[in-house]
């Protein structure tokens, strides 16, 4: 009798920059217990993928775990899979890096396990048709993605119990369709339900393919209790063992070598079903969700659903400009570095070592995991980008004092940017708002301006409609939830923090605010802006002045008061020295309208990552702050200097002005989804320096603001 081939594939990953205690928890709750249970059941032969961050972690902290893996590989119980070393979205990194990252992980597996992997895990299953050419160049013979990809190309469920061939430029690879049904059954439903699914294939030579995250076996909410303490995994393996007369567990590679393909297929650009929803614009995402729910209630819903597709992964770059800027900064530097074959440098001095880490996918997108919303993950990517850029520039500039300037549309948004560098820092200016988007302290590898804008997400309506279940009620839920079903909240009243910004939270943003000014309205971005300078383009001019580089921004705009529009002009110049971490900004405002009043404000957004940590705080010389945390809220008058101190990273951000100002300070906090539900996250400290202006025709106002970084 023909047996059902049960192909069980697990993918384990932790992002670059994740905290060590998070990795240790994942190891204790998922990676180690899974392998310990697997060892007890030699009948279970599976495929497994660990990303490079985990290989590094195991080598540094748990070499004994690697020894266990070697034993299972030698016994044929584990098939190791390769992939991009730092889990990049392969489709959006340079082709040489596609191959380079895969080969690096393959080499690591060869060195540690003594085998050469045939198969590859595709990060986030983000498929694009050009990939086979580069996968084959890297030595990959097969990959596994989702059956969703195949269904979008017209295939049915019954067509997906094996693998298909696809190619690009004649380079052929084998592609397995992982079952969506099994992905939702395992390990959230009783093992018997999975066996029932497999039994439908009984008597055939079909394959049932499970391929999903290993973190769902212990890390996802409540799964450690269900999978190990209640014994789901052992019961599942025992159940398979009792039915070996008609089920044959085997690694994907064994099946690929033994069985013929089901046919040829060409797959459209896609990821898994949920990712295609998350990548949609917010309003479209909400509508898409409603359509999918309606289809579930329709008798023909399943048939129609095959032909409905969501978004496209690359649109995260359109959805989140912060993600796009980081991605394009990495690409821009990669182009400068060029082909590794032309360079001979020690590994520790190779900028590609760091640039590859900056390609790690997690902080470039957001779904129900924290992703982009987690500041420490964004910081880790910038940290590696800054290190790579510093190594590259060190080789380009032998002198101690130098300054470089580039004018270009580096991020493809249709507007001009200026990248300005000296040995101590990197600055990124945007013509939009004449703003500063990035300020890198090279000595600390730290972008101090990495603040995320507060945006409406498709899932926020769950909070607004009060359909959030308290995490305290989780224990009363009989069935373990998948990560996609969780709408719990880490604290009550999070809907009160749902404020959305009308502009990007950059720095040196120019505000005109009418009297009476209201702090709360401004903090919530629910105030009335009189000027039109926040999002409109400024004209750019650059000049070299001795050892200083100057960047001039000019915009003639208008001030809307009492339905009248009066002309007003802002000229601001940024002066940067050749060997310091400071930028001096001089403003000149010229008013051409009728006599009146307004308040001119300069907004800066600074992110030192920890809003409530005692070692990160405000210090205002000569003033006592009852609450000096970076997440504190307050208003002060007659201020000329503000310090934001980071004792952990041993740096201090200093803000000075030559005219005493009023100061508002408040945290930028987002409400986003994570693995365990809704959470509030500190994204940065917002500071508004403002001055009341008596407007007169032809009148001018001048002020100088200096932003600098010092080491502690």
Segment roles from a protein language model:
Residues 25-28, 96, 100-103, 426-543:
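Acidic-aromatic substrate-binding/catalytic surfaces of carbohydrate-active enzymes
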Residues 3-94, 100-101, 116-122, 141-147, ...:
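Short, well-structured secondary-structure segments
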Residues 2-32, 39-41, 160-165, 169-173, ...:
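Active-site and substrate-binding clefts of carbohydrate-active enzymes
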Residues 97-124, 199-210:
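CE4/NodB-like, metal-dependent polysaccharide N-deacetylase domain
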Residues 409, 525-571, 578-586, 592-593, ...:
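Beta-strand-rich recognition/accessory modules
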Residues 32-33, 60-75, 154-167, 192-200:
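Alpha-helical scaffolding within the catalytic cores
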Residues 581, 590-663:
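Polysaccharide-binding surfaces and accessory modules of carbohydrate-active proteins
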Residues 96, 111, 115-116, 121-166, ...:
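Gly/Pro-rich turn-and-neighbor structural signature
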């Amino acid at each position: 009798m023909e047996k059902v081939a049960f192909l069980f594939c697990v993918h384990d990953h932790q992002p670059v920059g994740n905290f060590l205690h998070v990795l240790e928890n994942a190891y204790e709750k998922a990676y180690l217990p899974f392998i310990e249970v697997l060892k007890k059941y030699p009948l279970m032969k599976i495929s497994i993928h660990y990303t490079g961050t985990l290989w590094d972690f195991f080598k540094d902290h748990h070499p004994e775990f690697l020894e266990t893996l070697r034993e299972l590989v030698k016994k044929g119980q584990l098939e190791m899979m390769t992939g991009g070393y730092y889990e990049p979205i392969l489709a959006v990194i340079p082709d040489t890096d596609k191959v380079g990252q895969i080969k690096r992980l393959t080499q690591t597996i060869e060195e540690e396990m003594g085998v050469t992997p045939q198969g590859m895990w595709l990060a986030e299953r983000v498929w694009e048709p050009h990939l086979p050419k580069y996968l084959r160049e890297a030595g990959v013979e097969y990959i596994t993605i989702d059956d969703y990809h195949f269904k979008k190309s017209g295939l049915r469920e019954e067509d997906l119990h094996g693998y298909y061939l696809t190619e690009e430029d004649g380079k052929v690879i084998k592609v397995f369709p992982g079952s969506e049904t099994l992905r939702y059954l395992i390990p959230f439903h009783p093992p018997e339900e999975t066996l029932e699914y497999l039994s439908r294939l009984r008597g055939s030579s079909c394959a049932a393919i499970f391929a999903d995250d290993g973190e769902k076996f212990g890390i996802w909410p409540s799964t450690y209790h269900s999978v190990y303490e209640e014994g789901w995994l052992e019961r599942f393996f025992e159940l398979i063992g009792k039915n070996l007369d008609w089920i044959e567990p085997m690694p994907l590679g064994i099946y690929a070598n033994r069985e013929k393909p089901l046919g040829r297929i060409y797959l459209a650009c896609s990821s898994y079903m949920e990712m295609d929803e998350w990548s949609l614009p917010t309003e479209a995402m909400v509508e898409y969700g409603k359509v999918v729910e309606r289809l579930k209630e329709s008798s023909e819903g399943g048939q129609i659903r095959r032909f409905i597709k969501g978004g496209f992964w690359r649109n995260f770059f359109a959805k989140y400009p912060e993600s796009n800027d980081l991605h394009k900064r990495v690409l821009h530097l990669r182009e400068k570095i060029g082909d590794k074959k032309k360079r001979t440098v020690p590994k520790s001095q190779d900028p590609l070592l760091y640039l590859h880490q900056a390609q790690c996918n997690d902080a470039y997108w957001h779904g129900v995991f924290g992703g982009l919303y987690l500041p420490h993950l964004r910081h880790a990517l910038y940290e590696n980008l800054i290190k790579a850029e510093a190594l590259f520039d060190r080789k380009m500039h032998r002198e101690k004092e130098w300054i470089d300037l580039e004018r270009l549309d580096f991020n493809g948004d249709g507007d001009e940017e200026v990248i300005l560098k000296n040995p101590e820092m990197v600055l990124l200016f945007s013509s939009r708002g004449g703003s500063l988007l990035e300020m890198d302290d090279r000595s600390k590898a730290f972008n101090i301006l990495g603040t995320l804008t507060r945006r409406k997400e498709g899932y926020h309506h769950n909070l607004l409609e009060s359909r959030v279940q308290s995490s305290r009620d989780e224990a009363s839920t009989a069935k373990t939830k998948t990560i996609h079903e969780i709408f719990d909240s880490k604290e009550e009243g999070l809907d009160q923090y749902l404020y959305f910004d009308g502009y990007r939270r950059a720095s040196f943003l120019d505000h005109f605010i009418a009297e009476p000014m209201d702090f709360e309205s401004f903090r919530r971005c629910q105030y009335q802006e009189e000027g039109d300078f926040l999002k409109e383009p400024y004209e750019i001019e650059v000049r070299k002045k001795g050892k200083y580089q100057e960047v001039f921004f000019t915009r003639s705009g208008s001030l809307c008061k009492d339905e009248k529009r009066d002309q007003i002009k802002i000229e601001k110049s940024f002066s940067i020295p050749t060997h310091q971490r400071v930028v001096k900004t001089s403003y000149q405002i010229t008013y051409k309208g009728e006599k009146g009043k307004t308040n001119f404000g300069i907004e800066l957004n600074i992110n030192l990552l920890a809003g409530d940590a005692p070692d990160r705080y405000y210090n205002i010389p000569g003033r006592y702050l009852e609450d000096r945390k970076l997440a504190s809220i307050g208003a002060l008058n007659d201020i000329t200097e503000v310090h934001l101190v980071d004792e952990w990273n041993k740096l201090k951000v200093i803000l000075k002005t030559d005219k005493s100002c009023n100061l508002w300070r408040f945290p930028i906090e987002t409400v986003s989804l994570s693995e365990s539900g809704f959470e509030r996250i500190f994204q940065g400290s917002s500071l508004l320096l403002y001055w009341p202006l008596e407007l007169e025709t032809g009148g001018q106002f001048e002020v100088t603001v200096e932003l600098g970084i010092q080491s502690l």
